[in-house]
């Protein structure tokens, strides 16, 4: 499924996301995350020792809800699945880019294991109070 231009705009801006994965027993786990996009997929950067990553090795289904930083009643919910991963230098460069996007400075924390970017393919998108007029396309 091709991402809607509103979803691309939300993921490209400094808007936070609630990222939900599933434990082996099916119970959900949600974290507030930085989010990105390559125009085709949503991108979530984490480390390989984190539960959110380990959960996706067992169950690829995820949910990403991105809200506007200046109006939390405007958001998009994306239901999808992890279809690929980016590792190594490209994943490290992505966390630096995200840190600059959200904090205007380099990523300040040490990497404990290895950075990884989860590529998420959208299966459904739901919009709440988001209109094309909310963006400069």
PLM segments and residue spans:
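Extreme N-terminal tail/first-helix region
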Residues: 1-17, 137
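Charged, gly/pro-rich active-site loop segments
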Residues: 2, 74-137
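Short secondary-structure boundary/capping segments
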Residues: 8-9, 34, 54, 107-110
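Short beta-strand segments
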Residues: 14-48, 56, 63-66, 77-78
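A short beta-turn/loop motif at secondary-structure boundaries
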Residues: 25-27, 69-72, 111-112
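Short, solvent-exposed aromatic-acidic interface loops
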Residues: 48-51, 102
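Short, surface-exposed beta-strand-loop junctions and turns on beta-sheet-rich folds
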Residues: 50-52, 71, 134-136
């Amino acid at each position: 499924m091709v991402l809607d231009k509103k979803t691309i705009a939300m993921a490209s801006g400094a808007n936070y996301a609630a990222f939900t994965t599933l434990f082996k027993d099916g119970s959900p786990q949600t974290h507030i995350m930085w989010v990105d996009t390559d125009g085709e997929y949503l991108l979530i950067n984490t480390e390989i020792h984190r539960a959110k990553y380990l959960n996706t090795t067992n169950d690829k289904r995820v949910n990403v809800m991105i809200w506007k930083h200046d109006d939390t009643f405007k958001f998009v919910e994306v239901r999808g699945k992890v279809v690929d991963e980016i590792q190594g230098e490209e994943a490290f460069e992505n966390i630096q880019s995200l840190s600059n996007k959200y904090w205007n400075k380099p990523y300040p924390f040490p990497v404990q294991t290895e950075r990884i970017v989860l590529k998420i393919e959208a299966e459904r998108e739901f919009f709440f109070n988001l209109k094309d007029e909310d963006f400069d396309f």
